[in-house]
Amino acid sequence: MRSIIKGRVWKFGNNVDTDAILPARYLVYTKPEELAQFVMTGADPDFPKKVKPGDIIVGGKNFGCGSSREHAPLGLKGAGISCVIAESFARIFYRNAINVGLPLIECKGISEKVNEGDELEVNLETGEIKNLTTGEVLKGQKLPEFMMEILEAGGLMPYLKKKMAESQ
């Protein structure tokens, strides 16, 4: 996993719930590449046709609220979303995203400072977010080191497998 991510912004508002991220009728699918074809269709039905690998989602407050389904961050990862930045996250979504290896950063004021289509450069190690379109630099909350280790391993399961192998 790269610690510097560059991508185009897809912007969403406050209280984007897991049904907007991945509607419940698609929970019969479990593979990231299958889920990708339905991701964000609860908010924008054409999103899967428009999103490109490396793109970044910017959300408002309470992004990922609702049910605790792991399918939502898994679908975002399957669609090639490189990072999710929001004013705040629902805690269960935050944890599920880390568990599946999807980077995210909380950044107060991000909604007012970026527009859809802007290009961002995100430093996961420092939390610095550069809007390459406007030149503005924002400071997000950097992830704790142990969460960075989980992301670098590709998610919680690969991380645990690595740790178990190291201890033998």
UniProtKB/Swiss-Prot annotation:
| Alphabetic keyword roster | Amino-acid biosynthesis, Branched-chain amino acid biosynthesis, Isoleucine biosynthesis, Leucine biosynthesis, Lyase
Record note on pH: Optimum pH is 7.5.
Q: CDD domains recorded for this chain? A: IPMI_Swivel
Enzyme class name: lyase
The pathway this protein participates in, as annotated, is: Amino-acid biosynthesis; L-leucine biosynthesis; L-leucine from 3-methyl-2-oxobutanoate: step 2/4; Amino-acid biosynthesis; L-isoleucine biosynthesis; 2-oxobutanoate from pyruvate: step 2/3
Activity as a function of temperature is given as: Optimum temperature is 70 degrees Celsius.
What's a single GO MF annotation on this record? Answer: (R)-2-methylmalate dehydratase activity
Which InterPro entries does this UniProt record tie to the protein? Aconitase/3IPM_dehydase_swvl (IPR015928), AconitaseA/IPMdHydase_ssu_swvl (IPR000573), IPMI_Swivel (IPR033940), LeuD (IPR050075), LeuD_type2/HacB/DmdB (IPR011827)
EC number(s) on file: 4.2.1.33, 4.2.1.35, 4.2.1.31
The disulfides recorded in the entry are none
Reactions that this protein is recorded to catalyse = (2R,3S)-3-isopropylmalate = (2S)-2-isopropylmalate; (3R)-citramalate = 2-methylmaleate + H2O; 2-methylmaleate + H2O = (2R,3S)-3-methylmalate; (R)-malate = maleate + H2O
Among the GO biological process terms of this entry, one is: isoleucine biosynthetic process
Q: Which family does it belong to?
A: Belongs to the LeuD family.
Task: State its role.
Answer: Enzyme with broad specificity that catalyzes reversible hydroxyacid isomerizations via dehydration/hydration reactions. Catalyzes the isomerization between 2-isopropylmalate and 3-isopropylmalate, via the formation of 2-isopropylmaleate, a step involved in leucine biosynthesis. Catalyzes the isomerization between 2-methylmalate and 3-methylmalate, via the formation of 2-methylmaleate (citraconate), a step involved in isoleucine biosynthesis. Also displays malease activity, i.e. catalyzes the hydration of maleate to form (R)-malate.
Q: Which NCBIfam families match?
A: LEUD_arch
PANTHER family registered for this protein in UniProt: 3-ISOPROPYLMALATE DEHYDRATASE SMALL SUBUNIT (PTHR43345:SF9), 3-ISOPROPYLMALATE DEHYDRATASE SMALL SUBUNIT 2-RELATED-RELATED (PTHR43345)
Listed under subunit, the entry gives: Heterotetramer of 2 LeuC and 2 LeuD. The heterotetramer that can be formed in vitro between HacA and LeuD is inactive.
Provide the protein name: Isopropylmalate/citramalate isomerase small subunit
Q: Which organism is it from?
A: Methanocaldococcus jannaschii (strain ATCC 43067 / DSM 2661 / JAL-1 / JCM 10045 / NBRC 100440)
What is the gene called? leuD
